[in-house]
């Protein structure tokens, strides 16, 4: 089956510190996005890779490995995350794509096994996404004080890549009014079943300065350093 990967990197978030959005900040000597793109370009069965960017980031994007050679295609994002994803989905229309992976550009440590088992889950469901069960105690707070606890049974921390049968998620995005937190929300609004796949604690989204330090350590371990 033909599979495309959509890497969403059009956001402008700067919670990680510095002047650049987190996906463009350096990690182990390369932009975060360079690590993310490398993971999907090496993934078995992925025939096309689309990178969704903010228009202001085009020059940076063109310098990434794979872009100049045409192995990574650039798509300009929209005013929101779901609009950005839809732009990429529309760019694939008529290309014979059967499955699509949608991934946060700021998750550079996604493993080949996670990509493979997320795609495999599409054999029995139109959508699939990795998640990690919530293990910490959950509190409800008000005015800086704990006012109650929350049962964590059945609660998960969502991750990406989120995988879908292409035509199903394209139709879901076309029908959605916007404002979704992720593509699972878009899919469920269209009545699509989404399978939960075992996620990975190392598949972190680099958002704060401490996340970069942890990601650096994990990359060093993976490299045997």
Swiss-Prot record:
Enzyme class name: transferase
Coiled-coil boundaries: none
Keyword Methyltransferase: no
EC number(s) reported in the record: 2.7.7.60
Site annotation Positions MEP for the nucleophilic attack: residues: 152, 205
Any Pfam family the entry gives: IspD
Catalyzed reactions per annotation: 2-C-methyl-D-erythritol 4-phosphate + CTP + H(+) = 4-CDP-2-C-methyl-D-erythritol + diphosphate
Superkingdom as given in the UniProt entry: Bacteria
MF terms (GO), sorted A to Z: 2-C-methyl-D-erythritol 4-phosphate cytidylyltransferase activity
Family: Belongs to the IspD/TarI cytidylyltransferase family. IspD subfamily.
Protein name: 2-C-methyl-D-erythritol 4-phosphate cytidylyltransferase
């Amino acid at each position: 089956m033909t599979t495309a990967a959509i890497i969403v990197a059009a956001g402008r978030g700067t919670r990680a510190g510095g002047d650049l959005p987190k996906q463009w900040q350096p990690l182990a000597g390369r932009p975060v996005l360079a690590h993310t793109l490398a993971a999907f370009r090496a993934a078995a069965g992925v025939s096309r890779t689309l990178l969704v960017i903010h228009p202001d980031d085009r020059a940076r994007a063109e310098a990434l490995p794979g872009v100049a050679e045409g192995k990574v295609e650039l798509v300009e994002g929209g005013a929101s995350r779901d609009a950005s994803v839809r732009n990429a989905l529309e760019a694939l229309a008529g290309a014979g794509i059967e499955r699509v992976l949608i991934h946060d550009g700021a998750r550079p440590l996604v493993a080949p096994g996670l990509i493979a088992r997320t795609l495999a889950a599409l054999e029995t469901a139109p959508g699939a996404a990795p998640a990690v069960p919530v293990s910490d105690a959950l509190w409800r707070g008000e005015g800086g004080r704990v006012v109650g606890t929350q049962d964590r049974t059945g609660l998960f921390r969502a991750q990406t890549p989120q995988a879908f049968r292409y035509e199903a998620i394209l139709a879901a995005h076309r029908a959605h009014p916007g404002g979704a937190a992720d593509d699972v929300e878009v899919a469920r609004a269209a009545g699509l079943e989404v399978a939960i796949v075992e996620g990975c604690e190392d598949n972190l989204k680099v958002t704060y300065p401490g996340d970069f330090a942890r990601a650096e350590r994990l990359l060093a371990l993976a490299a045997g350093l």
